UniProtKB/Swiss-Prot annotation:
PROSITE patterns: PID, TBC_RABGAP. Its main location: nucleus. The modification Phosphotyrosine is found at residue 949. The keyword Cytoplasm does not apply. Keywords: GTPase activation, Nucleus, Phosphoprotein. Residues 243-401 form the PID domain. Gene3D superfamilies: 1.10.10.2750, Pleckstrin-homology domain (PH domain)/Phosphotyrosine-binding domain (PTB), putative rabgap domain of human tbc1 domain family member 14 like domains, Ypt/Rab-GAP domain of gyp1p, domain 3. This is TBC1 domain family member 1.
Amino acid sequence: MEPITFTARKHPFPNEVSVDFGLQLVGSLPVHSLTTMPMLPWVVAEVRRLSGQSSKKEPGTKPVRLCVSPSGLRCEPEPGKSQQWDPLICSSIFECKPQRVHKLIHNSHDPSYFACLIKNDAANQQSICYVFKADDQTKVPEIISSIRQAGKIARQEELRCPSEFDDTFAKKFEVLFCGRVAVAHRKAPPALIDECIEGFSHVSGGFSSDQSRSALQPPGDGERGPRPMRKSFSQPGLRSLAFRKEFQDAGLRSSSFFSSFEESDIENHLISGHNIVQPTDIEENRTMLFTIGQSEVYLISPDTKKIALQKNFKEISFCSQGIRHVDHFGFICRESSGGGGFHFVCYVFQCTNEALVDEIMMTLKQAFTVAAVQQTAKAPAQLCEGCPLQGLHKLCERIEGMNSSKTKLELQKHLTTLTNQEQATIFEEVQKLRPRNEQRENELIISFLRCLYEEKQKVHIHIGEIKQTSQIAAENIGSELPSSATRFRLDMLKNKAKRSLTESLESILSRGNKARGLQEHSASLDLDSSVSSMFSNTSKEPSGYEKEALPISESCFRLLGSSDDLSSDSESQLTEEPALLSPKQGFRRRANTLSHVPVECQEPPQLVRGSPGVSQRKLVRYHSVSTETPHERKDFESKADHISDASRTPVKTRRHSWRQQIFLRVATPQKACESPKRYEDYSELGELPPRSPLEPVCEDGPFGPVPEEKKRTSHELRELWQKAILQQILLLRMEKENQKLQASENDLLNKRLKLDYEEITPCLKEVTTVWEKILSTPGRSKIKFDMEKMHSAVGQGVPRHHRGEIWKFLAEQYHLKHPFPCKQQPKDTPYKELLKQLTSQQHAILIDLGRTFPTHPYYSAQLGAGQLSLYNILKAYSLLDQEVGYCQGLSFVAGILLLHMGEEEAFNMLKFLMFDMGLRKQYRPDMIILQIQMYQLSRLLHDYHRDLYNHLEEHEIGPSLYAAPWFLTVFASQFPLGFVARVFDMIFLQGSEVIFKVALSLLGSHKPLILQHENLETIVDFIKSTLPNLGLVQMEKTISQVFETDISKQLQAYEVEYHVLQEELIDSSPLSDNQRMDKLEKTNSSLRKQNLDLLEQLQVANGRIQSLEATVEKLLTSESKLKQATLALELERSALLQTVEQLRRQTAELGSQESDPTLPKPSGD
């Protein structure tokens, strides 16, 4: 019986599915890359015209097959029904990525035609317009939709999955973050880095010596000590240099300390910006991974597993290396400040040596150069107002939708703008082709215009490029103009505009209530728009550091009726109200100034014209800024109320005056044209600060009349404060609880992600219960468990979620049974302290991070949490064990440990495996122990599997060709994780000889398959590729064989045999004096190492002897004590026995007297 199958309809392109469409290719035409959508119908018409002119031998349309998929858009010729498609004969017409389809157009007059404009990667190359015809016009929308969907999916894939070039290009370096410096210019002298370092050391010393003084409070004149240094830089613009470094105190989380290089007046202009990188305390980890990408640099903290700083190349303006401190470097970048501007900050870092700094500087230079070239190549071509194609674009927009006659008139008008020669040429070319009708004539004219404008576009220089130098000069001249003269002219023009506008509004007001209603709903009119346009060529917006140098009185503006103005009276308000106008105010956005009608009583013009240095206050959205007095305010309120009451009655629509028509024509369209940022919804009004009663805002808000707020008593204010404080405390508690829940959830997800592998020996519930009972034993770290019981438990299986805890338990049992370490232990340096240092092995570690378990989800993310934790472990061990440092293969060992436990616990277990279990010997730089291990494996094969050994020797295959990764990575680089985890179970139980037993069992169980291969390549490929893909049954069989095998004595014998053979070969071989001397020196060094090892073993043996002797003495002492106790007990026993006998005799005598009354009773004497 066949199984039941069904197919479900899926979304297009779920898994790179290609959709084919049978079409007719009408033709193609190369056009300029700046071709716009209005031009495209005329291009299609030209393609169809050229296709209709083709001869009978070469038909105009070709049957093609259009293949659409997210990976590519391909057009191939259709061979026909009788022929089979052959890729050697039928090559594709074009092939491109779907995101390169720039425009798609569907012909509305003839729905069976559509066209696509394919844009080339290079900006200077031409685009190609392909025109297709479908046999069924109803399929055209489906084809267009499929192409758009394919392009959308392809673009999403590009954003979701970065290219491989990004990962390979990014270079990572470990650096130590020293601090950040606020500077006043984007460039700096070469000695900046050295001065920063000296300033950091001075700041650190000053802060530690005087911790009682607040870090943010500058010292007084009497307390001011000597400055760290004072230097006048010759580079212009570098006026001040301020150090900022953050520390941590017992009472303060972080604080900032400023120390200036310049005179005392510079302290008023210290740059205060947001500290993006929170520099940690000296007691915290300040090491970072400095990563250089294609277009940005970023700092990753391995401690927090987060990006601490990310800067684009555009924001970096200066990079330098220290002159005296050659192991330091830094860069200056732009950062945004709280006021909307920006300032410049220099970040300083330290490396391990000068060579690493040189490499970083070279990498930065290359990255900047490549990014600049790519940015220039990828810059999109744009049209300026003077572009020839811009004129053609506007012409096509004008004639769009016109009939042939009107289009012909527009084209004739446009031709008059050309030169006589160009007009004559176009006229002659059109007459040569003899168009049948006006439409064909129009198409020909557009075609020749397009060719003419495309030729002009090739030699055209954009307006922005021409005026670039002149604009810079004009900006410089404009910035040097006196601000007072500019403000005086601006005030005069504003007053004139205000008077003319007021007169217009008064006439409108007198016309009736209908005009009043229209004015209330119209958009605002910016009084300064014409003025700002007139002064746009002579004024310039100041740059970031120029803004910061402005005094506070010139850069800050206060609104009328704000909280600062409540304390002032009406008279002082009139005199103090105008504020200084900044150059930036001329370019501000339009503000709502017509939400209500101005007062009839105009303020005297001399108030504004009297002082040329003052002007109107800055306008704000939904605020009406004026300079009226409180008395004028009352008059206005009464009149406004009267007008609002009168406006509720219906009024007949009357004809507007010429001033009203001008006003409505100017003001009304602004409401529809303004950007959405300008007109925000009324929900934002609730977040605005409360306005003063003096402020002339509209009385009727969007939600009705605004009630006047009452002044609250102190008791009510106190209750509000208490309520707010309690709510804040509750919110903080809830936030902490949410963070705890989120952290626990992340830990569970992280643990589940780590243990994402298949177990080889699934644990039964009984076995899991046994392990849980063992792990829950109180004081288990001091209790010795039975070895047979532990062997049995490990043999039955280890639960995956308890594996890390079980490994720690087995390590504790090893330390209990071996109280004296068999080898010299490393320094007891805390893990956190090791992470604060820089390692010289960073390059090798960073390279191997991507190679370690690349398919596992925990390590697959580039510089994710898994890779950063693994980097920390390997870095800490390289600093702890200077002799070994880092060796390839250690990343796999540490990676397996990290999957089953935390970061610091994995580091401790790595130390246990390396020093206590003896794995450290095989990672030494000389690799002598690894050679001995290869010899031992060969001898095991010779003794246990002779035929396999002979087969491998026949093809000259030594163990180093296939077994070296097994020993260095403990099978983790080639075998499944479940199998490797079981190998680690046995290593923690039995030691490093487990690796030999597993290798011997694997080769022995696959011996028949290996013997079938008859050459070196196939044998090695089978051992490396096929053999690791074991089945579950074969893996369990291998593990059970390892538990039953004991080869410890053979391994010791083979090691001694290796050393004997090495000495014999050295003595027997005829060598020259130099060679003999070299070998003798090598032998001497190896013998010294052996002597050191023997001395270590001797020390261990002496320690064991001393411990045994001490144990014997303790036992003898306890034995003598026990003997004395036994003797005392025996004496006590004899005394008790005598007492019992006496009691028995007395009892017998008493019994006999009671039975015979004639016997005299014993006297009471």
